[in-house]
A protein has these predicted regions:
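Interface amphipathic segments
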Residues: 1-216
């Protein structure tokens, strides 16, 4: 562990944890080394966490105190709007911190195994999200071979983008012909609106025929 601080705004931590053994009633886990690299100053916050094929990175403008304050203000704004049942996307966007968070992971790491222990399985996850009080929320989330509560989804692709004053999103869920449960393709398009969210969904069967079309 390497720790440096001025006991004010500047803190730096670099650490490696190894030789860890975690026991549950069913299995014993011996995760590979966990490496953490965290830096925060008045003008920036940077964090990296690596463990096997798990790689998480976060970079934001401003120190950790400013980041926590912005997140608290964002939460307060969202909760207030939900209570009033009226969404003001511009007001929400003003509270976004300026930052980016990326995640790539497979199954060969302690965190994925812990998630699996809790009943969720996946092959790979790839996420890239960017927030800004000017450009809003933009990014993607890709998941391959997701199993949740006994339901297997072969491919999940989701995107979020801010266009003008509106946050829009798309999603595609595909189960190929080798899926043992259901073969289908679902497409979702939507955007946040003042009174909630406008959603359009289409579901195609194994032959590519449109089976369900829903607009809310």
């Amino acid at each position: 562990v390497d720790l440096k601080t001025n006991l004010k705004e500047d803190h730096y931590l670099q650490a490696m944890l190894g030789s860890i053994v975690i026991k549950t009633q069913q299995k014993e886990y011996r995760p590979v080394d966990i490496v953490a690299d965290v830096l925060t100053r008045r003008d920036t916050t940077h964090a990296v966490l690596n463990c096997g094929d798990f790689h998480l990175r976060m970079d934001t403008h401003g120190g950790y105190k400013k980041l926590l304050s912005r997140l608290d203000e964002l939460q307060g704004e969202v909760m207030s709007q939900l209570k009033n049942r009226r969404i003001d996307q511009v007001a929400i966007r003003r509270e976004f911190p300026l930052g980016r968070i990326t995640l790539t992971t497979g199954k060969d790491n302690f965190i994925s195994r812990f998630i699996e222990y809790n009943g969720y399985h996946f092959k790979t996850v790839d996420m890239d999200l960017r927030t800004s009080p000017i450009s809003g929320l933009n990014g993607h989330l890709n998941i391959d071979s997701l199993v949740a509560q006994g339901v297997q989804l072969d491919t999940v692709r989701a995107n979020v983008m801010t266009q003008g004053d509106t946050i829009r999103y798309t999603a595609r869920i595909v189960n190929n012909k080798k899926n043992p449960q259901y073969v289908f393709q679902a497409l979702v398009d939507g955007e946040l609106a003042e009174r909630g969210s406008d959603i359009a969904a289409r579901i195609y069967d194994a032959n590519g025929k449109l089976g369900v079309r829903v607009g809310l």
